[in-house]
Amino acid sequence: MTPEEVSREVRRIEITTRHLVRDIVAGEYSSAFRGRGVEFAEVREYQPGDDIRTIDWNVTARLGAAYVKRYLEERELSVLFIVDMSASGGFGTRLRTKGQLGAEVAAVLALAAARNNDRIGGLFFTDRVEYHLGPAKGRRHVLRFISDLLAFAPAGTGTDLGAALAELEPTLRRRAIIFVLSDFMATGYESVLGRIARRHDVVGLHLIDPRERELPAAGLVTLWDPETGAWRRVDTGDAELRAHFARRTEEFDRGLDRLMRERGADLLRLETGRPYAEPLLSFFRRRERMLWR
């Protein structure tokens, strides 16, 4: 993208997603990540959009106005986006590619976090770490992150999520929310993911495309692996091959679900051919219920 195209796309995302950003912030965003184990900091007067469960009823009764409790994480929380920029992100057969879906979802979540006065940071990776932006607050910073995300042209093509998480780990001095946006077609990241998830909120956003889940019966086709450059000719008219492909996909999904659960991370699947607003809102509602039950 040219700088002018990037600016237009940033503005488009801001305009078309502003209601979603508002709904995320006004809904369960804060309570979905600030549940147990937070440190009390102070009380302040209630403001529209505050979680009513944080109202300090003793102070409210004494002063005759609604006051809420604030916690340390409300002022110290960082939201980090670990974004897979490998070549497989260029695949998409519906509304957008996986990479475009990941970029827009990361932009929406970054805008929501900025509106919540959280710090925003990012790390982009392929088979190497290619970009690392330290967390900071402010509209200018979040717009820089989104612009960099949209304009980024990676040097690598492969995927090494383990290397990305290993570089991130020593920089995490305070509790953080970490969104990992990837198709997770990688290995060797399990241990470092578990270490990070023990101290931080880790959410995997699994970016998928329907054609990666089910092959059409289109006869002989040539498939290309964008990360390795390998070509393979297959007969998609073979029902047994298509069934095997579908089974392998299901096995991959179950394995990823199990891995995330065992390592203490959360997981949400987002598909290139479907709107992502409701899945995001449902995810925050589900996390909120789990933390406050």
Annotated model-derived regions:
Residues 53, 75, 141, 157-160, ...:
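Helical mechanochemical/support elements of P-loop NTPase systems and associated helical scaffolds
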Residues 1-139, 167, 177-180, 186-187, ...:
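An amphipathic, basic-hydrophobic helix/alpha-beta surface used to engage anionic
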Residues 100, 155-162, 247-250:
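Conserved phosphate-coordination/catalytic loops
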Residues 141-176, 188, 209-211:
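Von Willebrand factor
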Residues 132-148, 285:
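Short, electropositive alpha-helical surface patch
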Residues 180-181, 272:
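Small/polar loops that bind or transfer phosphate-bearing groups
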Residues 104, 108, 159-166, 254, ...:
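Short, contiguous clusters of charged residues that form electrostatic/catalytic patches at enzyme active sites
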Residues 1-32, 42, 51, 167-174, ...:
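Von Willebrand factor type A / integrin I
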